[in-house]
């Protein structure tokens, strides 16, 4: 299967290919994750598998979701020496995931190695993005680990570095999106956690926006977890979010 690759040189917005919503499968076990997948449609969202779920269920869960027609974002945030990260990214590509990420703080050589590892996969390579500043972190948190300046400024620096290394986009807070679109261009994908539909609890995310607000500032892919996975009717919740994101949808 050929997956969409977002190039920093592309003039097309990544939102033009598929749903902009990525649902975080933050469940206790694979059975619950698959039960959720059976309640929604692949056309409504992509699905994100993080460290907890992948450690517990492994590649089998990815394949089970793919068999149901879903594109999978493997959110393992690889951060290691360049050779190790290159091999990990290559393994993710072999698994057929739609998107995979690395930590931008791993540096230029690490990100470049990850990019090079995907060249043999051609059009079947996953979208490769970098994590800038975790949305759970604020300026004070960064000062605690020796990074001066604001979380926003640091995220922008890391995003520019990731683009220079040939990555397709970054994970960032919605608060940096408008600035990043200006600095990196419309074709550089912005993937944003900390998105909460109106009326939802902010949870453990400190910097949050609603889906419509995020879209308006340039976010391409919105990661949403509990407001969808814990909804009484996840498909209806997704449908409402997607409707809101349509032109004039907020007025319906």
UniProtKB/Swiss-Prot annotation:
Enzyme class: lyase
Pathway: Pyrimidine metabolism; UMP biosynthesis via de novo pathway; UMP from orotate: step 2/2
SUPFAM superfamilies to which the protein is assigned, alphabetical: Ribulose-phoshate binding barrel
Biological process annotations from GO: 'de novo' pyrimidine nucleobase biosynthetic process; 'de novo' UMP biosynthetic process
Keywords from the named record: Decarboxylase, Lyase, Pyrimidine biosynthesis
Keyword Lyase: yes
Reaction(s) the record says it catalyses: orotidine 5'-phosphate + H(+) = UMP + CO2
PROSITE patterns membership: OMPDECASE
EC number: 4.1.1.23
Gene Ontology CC terms, in alphabetical order: cytosol
Catalytic residues, chain numbering: 77 (proton donor)
Binding, substrate: 26, 48, 75-84, 135, 196, 205, 225-226
Molecular functions per Gene Ontology: orotidine-5'-phosphate decarboxylase activity
Pfam families assigned to the protein according to its UniProt record, in alphabetical order: OMPdecase (PF00215)
NCBIfam families associated with the record: PRK00230.1, pyrF
Family stated for the protein in its record: Belongs to the OMP decarboxylase family. Type 1 subfamily.
Purpose: Catalyzes the decarboxylation of orotidine 5'-monophosphate (OMP) to uridine 5'-monophosphate (UMP).
Subunit-structure text: Homodimer.
Protein name from the UniProt record: Orotidine 5'-phosphate decarboxylase
Originating species: Sodalis glossinidius (strain morsitans)
Gene giving rise to this polypeptide: pyrF
């Amino acid at each position: 299967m050929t997956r969409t690759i977002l190039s920093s040189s592309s003039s097309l917005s990544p939102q033009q290919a598929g749903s902009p919503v990525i649902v975080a499968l933050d469940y206790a076990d694979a059975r619950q994750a698959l039960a959720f997948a059976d309640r929604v449609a692949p056309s409504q969202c992509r699905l994100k598998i993080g460290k907890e779920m992948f450690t517990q269920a492994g590649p089998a869960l990815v394949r089970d979701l793919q068999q149901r027609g879903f594109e999978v974002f493997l959110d393992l945030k690889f951060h290691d020496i360049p050779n190790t990260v290159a091999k990990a990214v290559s393994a993710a590509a072999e698994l057929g995931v739609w998107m995979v990420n690395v930590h931008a703080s791993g540096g230029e050589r690490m990100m470049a190695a990850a990019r090079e590892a995907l060249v043999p996969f051609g059009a079947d390579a996953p979208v490769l993005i970098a994590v800038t500043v975790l949305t759970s972190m604020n300026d004070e948190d960064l000062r605690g680990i020796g990074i001066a300046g604001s979380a926003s400024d640091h995220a922008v620096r890391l995003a520019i570095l990731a683009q220079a290394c040939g990555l397709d986009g970054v994970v960032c807070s919605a608060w940096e999106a408008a600035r990043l679109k200006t600095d990196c261009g419309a074709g550089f994908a912005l993937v944003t956690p900390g998105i909460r539909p109106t009326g939802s609890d902010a949870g453990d995310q400190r910097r949050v926006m609603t889906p419509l607000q995020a879209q308006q500032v340039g976010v391409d892919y919105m990661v949403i977890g509990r407001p969808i996975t814990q909804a009484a009717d996840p498909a209806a919740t997704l449908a409402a979010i997607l409707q809101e994101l349509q032109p004039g949808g907020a007025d319906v």
